């Protein structure tokens, strides 16, 4: 098992795009646009690997001074509930702290709220629709 930073455009990045498509986009009938993927060049990309196989991923993007947004978190379907997501979030939080960020925010799908609450995140604001499904803003001070 290894947690590591992924380089945009690498073989690992291609695995990351494929995993996010399978878990986050395909069920909604959506695709990634080339423009969306190009914007990810400036994001911090993270993966959870078992040997060379990507089992989970997420990314951080700076949104304001001292704040990053956790985005595009995905874990292989059959491996959810085994600690991969938790390990990824903790890894991302540690990288954010090392880079002197003070807060992490996210647009969490309603179904994932209990998971993030266990990791110390709290909801902020009202529910809204994003990519056709209900979300809520969650945040955590680092």
Give the label of every model feature segment.
Residues 1-142:
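Anionic, Ser/Thr-rich low-complexity intrinsically disordered regions
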